[in-house]
């Protein structure tokens, strides 16, 4: 007889949410939600919607890919939905699944997001149709995968095309962001794309997929978040998932060590019209750590994602107009450059600090590389004033409504909470009170502890015509070009505020990167993501 987890219900109120609702911006409607927390791997968010939302996070991802078969986690997840499931004599293919789910809306067709340590499936279905949905879709999808050869060939081919054509040559910004995501973790299970590698994808067989599925896809290895509160429907949901216990994990992915010195990977595309710049290094910080919220506030001040508030944006974009934006991060942010607010469900045991400078003109690349490094160095050494911390806290509080704006996002954060061991006091639940409690001393202590500019990994994406030249310039500290006063539209006599910009430019230009040529590699985009090893 299959063992199933028993659920006792505990009700928690999102008190910070209710308090914030009284101070919400004009015109913004936001309803406090109550959350039922089960003493297991299932949480529910109460909703009055006639639709059920279900998110299922499997505690596995590309970090568990077998060596030489990188992409296994990704193909397994995609194949559960698109590789055929159910009875072999009448398989539910992608086309059949679309027909089955069409009466229930587009969101009833399952979607999946695969990251390094988590794979998350999402569906939305009418309450009235849930029993039929479980019977026809959810249960056979998770318990009767068929790995149809034709569908597997299609999924493999599509994924290879995404990497070989799309990512390498058509998406300059994603190329740089994902290359850095790998580069800072060189030599670890995190050092390849969640989608896999070219050679790894080509080597994967159907038995590989089935073995991975049987090992990791068990109820005990899943976290579930849903708007279902009816006990019978909850039982149907749990019964639809494969039985099994949690997987023992001896590996410690928080053990990454920052390599001494500065290292640069320059990736060249045939016809890149601008140069993208990135830097980063691993940090041992999780959302459950006491330093998280002080560093969160600090990062809001330094480089809040897709916002003009941050210092990096103000200095490089607003005051000087070099690019479309400059941002910093204390954890991986999925979906850049597209998402305004990075979505949840990509939790990791090992995170990294990074700065992303959106593409600049080739002639300014060396200068902006110095500028972003110098600004990080200054921030790490000087920290923040009490006034700056106070301003950053106000901005950080304002993010709350965006992070919690939908039930879907709330479910995702609850899954992350389970991953990080924060079930009893979740990320959104504690966000406002923890930000309010942050002091300037705590912020500066966190900056001192986690931020530095001496040991950095850089990823630069530029054109093939610029790659070797830029490597020589960086190593030799030559050809550092900023804009001229005329390009800044500064008239003579120079106003005092504009003189400050020119003076700061001189300091940035003189900032020593001290990167020897031996620490700089130039590789063509066509060589990226071929194997798990560095190109």
Predicted regions and their residues:
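M16/MPP (pitrilysin/insulinase) zinc-metallopeptidase core fold and M16-derived inactive scaffolds
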Residues: 25-27, 55-124, 132, 191-195, ...
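Buried hydrophobic packing residues in well-ordered domains
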Residues: 39, 56, 74-76, 121, ...
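Non-catalytic, conformational "gating/processing" segments within enzyme and secreted inhibitor domains
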Residues: 151, 161, 165-168, 177, ...
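Hydrophobic h-region of N-terminal signal peptides that target proteins for export
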Residues: 11-20
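An aromatic/glycine/proline-enriched structural segment found at the starts
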Residues: 23-27, 186, 218-219, 223-285, ...
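Extracytoplasmic
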Residues: 27-32, 37-40, 48-55, 59, ...
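Scaffold signal of the M16-like zinc-metallopeptidase fold and its non-catalytic homologs
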Residues: 166-218, 238, 320, 327, ...
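Acidic/histidine-enriched segments that form metal/cofactor-coordinating
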Residues: 94-212, 257-260, 370, 374, ...
